[in-house]
Amino acid sequence: MDKFRVQGPGRLSGEVTISGAKNAALPILFAALLAEEPVEIQNVPKLKDIDTTMKLLSQLGTKVERNGSVWIDASQVNIFCAPYELVKTMRASIWALGPLVARFGQGQVSLPGGCAIGARPVDLHITGLEQLGAEIKLEEGYVKASVQGRLKGAHIVMDKVSVGATVTIMSAATLAEGTTVIENAAREPEIVDTANFLNTLGAKITGQGTDKITIEGVERLGGGVYRVLPDRIETGTFLVAAAISGGKVMCRNTRPDTLDAVLAKLREAGADIETGEDWISLDMHGKRPKAVNVRTAPHPAFPTDMQAQFTLLNLVAEGTGVITETIFENRFMHVPELIRMGAHAEIESNTVICHGVEKLSGAQVMATDLRASASLVLAGCIAEGTTVVDRIYHIDRGYEGIEDKLRALGANIERIKGE
């Protein structure tokens, strides 16, 4: 397995170009199964999960090509089962189910794998599809969905806010007969992006970005060209990199309007922030950040995917900050690793109390999930001495070329190829 060796401490300053959002590209790629004509998707990041998705789509009979953009032609799809071999590495595969049953009347997806953070049941996907008229069976580790004729529009009230299930229901409902209303829908920018993509193909979706999405079913979806929105979590990660190192960074090709809660907390931590239509700059003027209290919650509140980065910020800040995680259990696995680097923190159920220290020291640490591992790499950039981060395949699942981008900001980082 590959590792990163990071030599610190360094101040991170410079420019970084933000990639397309993985969490929008994935649902969009799966939603392309609904299209009867070719689709061109631009700004798709080069990531392991994206490669897996492209493999999965081609196993279903989709023509998939990548040259700059990703080109998808799902007109010849003739296999309706997403096999365990591919699904086990990536839980997003469940998103194949809605489009398959909506367009072809049948679909099977193996129960998914992915990051080891907490319980992420597929129940909400299943109940949503059942409410649209699909019959669902769980057999031999597969979720099997079928419907006679078309799905039927329904009024669906989500038990809890779920990005994944909102995508499944919204995608499937585009080809249902009649109108579907999703109440208590997720409001994330990636949901809005997926809806806008579907509308480009001829869907009739309104209300995306609010907690009530309305989908008027259509008979078919055609082709189109769509550009995936920039990755707000990658943006936030590089802003934190500058904030914890007293540096100055300019993020280009990003969308400040998707990061309100994060920018507010960075300003509270003492960062000087300016924004334009597609850029954000942050300047710490060489100062240490001030500790901030953070509570994760569904969008537009503070995102759980930025929690680990702000835990690190608090651990090197002036003062004490409290971080409360309300979305996933088991999402403080980076904290014991940071404690090995000299951080002072106590975990109490879903809260971590961070006492800022002036400096961290390099150590051997292990990545546990995607965002936690990015924080360990950033910690290595500012720690004294050498840090080795093991199991970085987690990072490769969600950050495109993170070592190249950090190097451009002045980090001393290299990838050590595993056996």
UniProtKB/Swiss-Prot annotation:
Pfam families: EPSP_synthase
PTM-bearing positions, type 2-(S-cysteinyl)pyruvic acid O-phosphothioketal: 115
Residues that bind phosphoenolpyruvate: 22-23
UniProt key word Metal-binding: no
Record InterPro entries: Enolpyruvate_Tfrase_dom, Enolpyruvate_Tfrase_sf, MurA_subfamily, RNA3'P_cycl/enolpyr_Trfase_a/b, UDP_GlcNAc_COvinyl_MurA
Keywords in alphabetical order: Cell cycle, Cell division, Cell shape, Cell wall biogenesis/degradation, Cytoplasm, Peptidoglycan synthesis, Pyruvate, Transferase
Compartments, record wording: Cytoplasm
Domain of life of the organism encoding this protein: Bacteria
One GO biological process term: cell wall organization
Enzyme Commission code: 2.5.1.7
Database matches in CDD domains: UdpNAET
Recorded catalytic activity of this chain's protein: phosphoenolpyruvate + UDP-N-acetyl-alpha-D-glucosamine = UDP-N-acetyl-3-O-(1-carboxyvinyl)-alpha-D-glucosamine + phosphate
Active site: 115 (proton donor)
Pathway(s) it belongs to: Cell wall biogenesis; peptidoglycan biosynthesis
Cellular component terms (Gene Ontology): cytoplasm
SUPFAM superfamilies: EPT/RTPC-like
UniProt entry tagged with the keyword Cell wall biogenesis/degradation: yes
NCBIfam families found in the cross-reference section: murA, PRK09369.1
Family assignment from sequence similarity: Belongs to the EPSP synthase family. MurA subfamily.
Function in brief: Cell wall formation. Adds enolpyruvyl to UDP-N-acetylglucosamine.
HAMAP family for this protein: MurA (MF_00111)
Name of this protein: UDP-N-acetylglucosamine 1-carboxyvinyltransferase
Species in which this protein is naturally found: Cronobacter sakazakii (strain ATCC BAA-894) (Enterobacter sakazakii)
Gene: murA
